[in-house]
Amino acid sequence: MIYSNLLKKHYSDWPSLEKAIEALPTAKARGNVFEEFTFAYFTIKKQMYQIAEIYPSADIPDKYRKAFKLGNKQHQDSGVDGLIITNEGKSIAYQCKFRSGRVKPTYEELTKFWSDGRYCDYCCTVANSFAVSNLSDKHEENLQILAKDFDSLDQEFFDQLYDLVNNENAGKNKVFYEPYDYQKRIIKEVLVGFSVENRGKVIAACGTGKTLTSLWIVEAMKAETVLFLAPSISLVKQTLEAWADQAKIPFTYLCVCSDNTVSSNIDDDEADISVSQLGVTRNYKHQRDCQVLRPHKG
């Protein structure tokens, strides 16, 4: 990937970069830079999205073009801006939509993409808007990465972005947090507890860092299989993002939703998000999931 000079500058947050992209003179120029940013975003977030391979549209290998019927390299208006192959071999076609003022892309704009990417396992809409068409939530194969995801990116991400687009090691500025003293005490007591008991419970107040404390406990125990249960999709996303960012050993995850209507009434709970806004692959086939989690013999 050859990155534009605009991306090679050092930014501190997404609004600053977004403003710079908005200042470009044409919609095509803005779209091109956003596609480059999206490619870099996925490259930095490979653990989060379980990415084995990623290609911008022009670089998609012929074997994948043929397998997923994405047209040839000269077919530039296919609606698919890039392709991801996950660690477990799933295919994700993605399309980038940048709009000044964070205007939501229309249903008509997205239907061509959904049509052209229909032979992939998933279609992911990447947009700088707060939402896309509600019809996207009707299909469990649709994923979304939106403005809220970009707004939450921290300084460390943009340090990595700067290194990546300037051909440096994107991980050289990676910062791994260390537990506070009270978290060290929690970790120690949990390890001692599990040495003599099969069950335990940690009760801690909000804001005490339970998400990362749980990760450090898992790493200290050298656990091979972890079941994480959450009451909302947004909490699943929050935990997955934190663990993917801070895990010192790469891990594979499997997101399971109770059913495909779990987020059908999210207007009643402003704190939650739709399943598609989880942004990662997931499924509802419980029997298969139980098989995956069952210990293998031999």
Region spans (language model):
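Structural motif
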Residues: K97-F98, V126-F130
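Catalytic centers of nucleases
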Residues: A29-R118
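SF2 helicase/translocase NTPase motor core
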Residues: I2-W14, E22-A23, A27-A29, P56-K73, ...
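Short linear interaction motifs
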Residues: K19-L24, G79
